[in-house]
Amino acid sequence: MRTLYPEITPYQQGSLKVDDRHTLYFEQCGNPHGKPVVMLHGGPGGGCNDKMRRFHDPAKYRIVLFDQRGSGRSTPHADLVDNTTWDLVADIERLRTHLGVDRWQVFGGSWGSTLALAYAADPSAAGHQLVLRGIFLLRRFELEWFYQEGASRLFPDAWEHYLNAIPPVERADLMSAFHRRLTSDDEATRLAAAKAWSVWEGATSFLHVDEDFVTGHEDAHFALAFARIENHYFVNGGFFEVEDQLLRDAHRIADIPGVIVHGRYDVVCPLQSAWDLHKAWPKAQLQISPASGHSAFEPENVDALVRATDGFA
């Protein structure tokens, strides 16, 4: 079974001002003359991390990571203004142009898969290969499954902590109730809601719960960006024209080679979405990890993803 490549450090770290408000952090790792790949983190709001550098052979790939608007080391932190899917799609192209890349492989999981699909379907985009994991198409049933009722029945212990952040009278629409708190003028209210929202996802991302991963989701800086930006996108339907926009536009990526990796027991993003995407995009290879959950760092998911990037190298 393949594992992550060894730890590496960036050969360049920088910032890119993408408009009058937002400045993005980016870094480059691996071989400056290698095959370019852009890594799209999850959330939205999750930010990139050091382990994301390790899915590609650093001798063969020029690995570009960046923190999306409001995330990680990008500024302003946890900001919701001018922060939509289409702003992020445009930012990917701005970064590509800034770095002098003609075209690149696009690698993304969870929300990163959503953004990768939106980007690849844009006629002006320059993604020529897709490596996707934990497919999330941002349809209403996906959101309701995870944030209203569904996953709650598999993780009732973790769900109770999430649910307790909202009074019973407001629980008929939990995403909206969290939205009111995450956009509150009161800092303590925002932070309490952010931690409850963030920890819920952290507690459900692995087949076997990773307590360190859950603890990381309690970090105030991480949780505020993660919860505020996720919730902002979700209550706005991803800023899509129609709910199934990514499937509607799948014909635009019909000739792009790709690999879809999805854990059989992914509770955060159920396998149905990967199945639906594969039917709409049959050129892609669908690899179901039989004993894995959502996280990219589940051993089977790592194995499949590293094999995919090696295959495209």
From Swiss-Prot:
Main location: cytoplasm
Reaction catalyzed: Release of N-terminal proline from a peptide
The keyword Cytoplasm is assigned to this record: yes
Active site: 110 (nucleophile), 266, 294 (proton donor)
GO biological process: proteolysis
Entry EC number(s): 3.4.11.5
Pfam family, one: Abhydrolase_1
One term of GO molecular function: aminopeptidase activity
InterPro entries, per database record: AB_hydrolase_1 (IPR000073), AB_hydrolase_fold (IPR029058), Peptidase_S33 (IPR002410), Pro_iminopeptidase (IPR005944)
GO CC, alphabetical: cytoplasm
Superkingdom: Bacteria
Localization per record: Cytoplasm
PANTHER family named among the record's database cross-references: PROLINE IMINOPEPTIDASE (PTHR43722:SF1)
Protein family: Belongs to the peptidase S33 family.
Quaternary context: Homooligomer.
Function of the molecule: May be involved in proline metabolism and sensitivity to ascamycin. Has ascamycin dealanylating activity.
Name this protein carries in UniProt: Proline iminopeptidase
Organism the protein comes from: Xanthomonas citri
Lineage: Bacteria, Pseudomonadati, Pseudomonadota, Gammaproteobacteria, Lysobacterales
